[in-house]
């Protein structure tokens, strides 16, 4: 497995692969891998001759009061896990490589970023879109693999790729979960044992919503009201947002007659967790 730090070296490496007719798959990450990351890498391995994984904790997608400085990092552990699942290249750039002196250019995706995380984390998606656009130009992948747990992020990146005529496929993969249903996240390490139990309210909310949907309920307000009451009864929780939105526009819907996603962000203690379920799709929670 090769480790690349410099942008020009990554670009040269990928260009040589493309000229040789080799297919590149790419998994962008912020590191501190869990099984969800590894599932994305396994999918990338199936789809490519060369699998590139980036590890970069992108400062432009964190707000001033967020967890940039304490975000978990362990490169040695990550590189070992990556090698075990067959990663060919880890791209591990510095801030100076990604955002050099006099950097001035940012990518803004408009409508699909105005709700949910876009409301509660101003500037977040500008940072996400910018770093992904830059990474796509550096790695030059044929396909990039993203998890559906960050559903709004996936929609945003697909919109950017379509609007800017980027020549790559964006692949969304199902959320990887712990055995008890909690969506895997690098931030789960922040949770105390008591908070870890309370965090199950997110996945249980999805199950509640799916049950109501399967029983024929299509009124978004009634589904949200029952979930809100449940989460508010769980210790150490505070709802950031709880909404049912269109899967294409990410705007609130009143009825689930169109393709819709339940999206929620909940603070458990001081840790902000997200989860979602697209109604009508499989929900891999027991």
Swiss-Prot record:
The residues that hold beta-alanine are 61
Q: Which Pfam families match?
A: Pantoate_ligase
Output the GO biological process annotations, alphabetical, semicolon-separated.
pantothenate biosynthetic process
Give the species.
Answer: Syntrophus aciditrophicus (strain SB)
- Describe the family membership recorded for this protein in Swiss-Prot or TrEMBL: Belongs to the pantothenate synthetase family.
Describe which pathway this protein belongs to, using the record's wording: Cofactor biosynthesis; (R)-pantothenate biosynthesis; (R)-pantothenate from (R)-pantoate and beta-alanine: step 1/1
Q: Which gene encodes it?
A: panC
- Residues that bind ATP: 30-37, 147-150, 184-187
| Single annotated GO MF | pantoate-beta-alanine ligase activity
Kindly indicate where the leader peptide sits in this chain.
Answer: none
Report which superkingdom the organism of origin falls in: Bacteria
Gene Ontology CC terms = cytosol
Q: Where in the cell is it found?
A: Cytoplasm
Q: What is this protein called?
A: Pantothenate synthetase
Which keywords does this chain's UniProt record carry? ATP-binding, Cytoplasm, Ligase, Nucleotide-binding, Pantothenate biosynthesis
- Write down the EC number: 6.3.2.1
Q: Binding residues for (R)-pantoate, per the UniProt record? A: 61, 153
Per the Swiss-Prot or TrEMBL record, the active site comprises 37
Q: What reaction does this catalyse?
A: (R)-pantoate + beta-alanine + ATP = (R)-pantothenate + AMP + diphosphate + H(+)
Any other comment in the entry? Answer: The reaction proceeds by a bi uni uni bi ping pong mechanism.
Give, as one word, the top-level EC class: ligase
Q: What does this protein do?
A: Catalyzes the condensation of pantoate with beta-alanine in an ATP-dependent reaction via a pantoyl-adenylate intermediate.
Which classification does the entry list for the species? Answer: Bacteria, Pseudomonadati, Thermodesulfobacteriota, Syntrophia, Syntrophales
Q: How does the annotation summarize its subunit structure?
A: Homodimer.
